Amino acid sequence: MRKAERARKTNETDIKLSFHIDGEGKADIQTDVPFMTHMLDLFTKHGQFDLSIEAKGDVEIDDHHTTEDIGICLGQALLEALGDKQGIKRYGSSMVPMDEALAQVAIDLSNRPHLEFRAEFPSRKIGTFDTELVHEFLWKFALEARMNLHVIVHYGTNTHHMIEAIFKALGRALDEAALIDPRVKGIPSTKGML
């Protein structure tokens, strides 16, 4: 069973997270950052993962610490759940439209953490959520999961739609990359290791 749990308690946040790669798209996400909760629901549903999160943070300051620490915990849980990565497809990509917006995500579960982020959002905020935190979340997620993550928003005029397309594409691309392919024997690399 490819599943992992993480807990992180600091002076800024208190997070408990459970992530199951081979799930059914079930989300039980409770955070004090409503927009992030919504995006993680979409990620879970479209990736067919099971994800449970209880997160509290110092949102009276802003949403930064909570959003960042969720990315850290989710990345660590993904890395553990993948195990030795034997038999996985390793690569995944998805292009998702959301009304006028189009986002593309490509992933390599390579143990070479990198984020390439090409998105310019028309609005700096959605409600109280700072849109720059999308980059912060994705960078911490990629770093802790040790994955190469490329995110491009090709176009869009509605910031909510653009970010929603990113999280749906992220779920779909990760589902593909983490999939066990019976044709893959051992580690999916000519080096023999990732």
From Swiss-Prot:
Which species is this UniProt entry from? Bacillus licheniformis (strain ATCC 14580 / DSM 13 / JCM 2505 / CCUG 7422 / NBRC 12200 / NCIMB 9375 / NCTC 10341 / NRRL NRS-1264 / Gibson 46)
Where does it reside?
Answer: Cytoplasm
The alphabetical list of record keywords is: Amino-acid biosynthesis, Cytoplasm, Histidine biosynthesis, Lyase
**What molecular function does GO assign, one term?**
imidazoleglycerol-phosphate dehydratase activity
So where does this one cross the membrane? none
Q: Which reaction does it catalyse?
A: D-erythro-1-(imidazol-4-yl)glycerol 3-phosphate = 3-(imidazol-4-yl)-2-oxopropyl phosphate + H2O
EC nos: 4.2.1.19
Q: What is its main location?
A: cytoplasm
- What is its pathway? Amino-acid biosynthesis; L-histidine biosynthesis; L-histidine from 5-phospho-alpha-D-ribose 1-diphosphate: step 6/9
Q: Which SUPFAM superfamilies does the record associate with it?
A: Ribosomal protein S5 domain 2-like
Gene that produces this protein: hisB
Please give the name of this protein.
Imidazoleglycerol-phosphate dehydratase
Kindly give the Pfam families that the UniProt entry links to this protein.
IGPD
Q: Which GO terms describe its cellular component?
A: cytoplasm
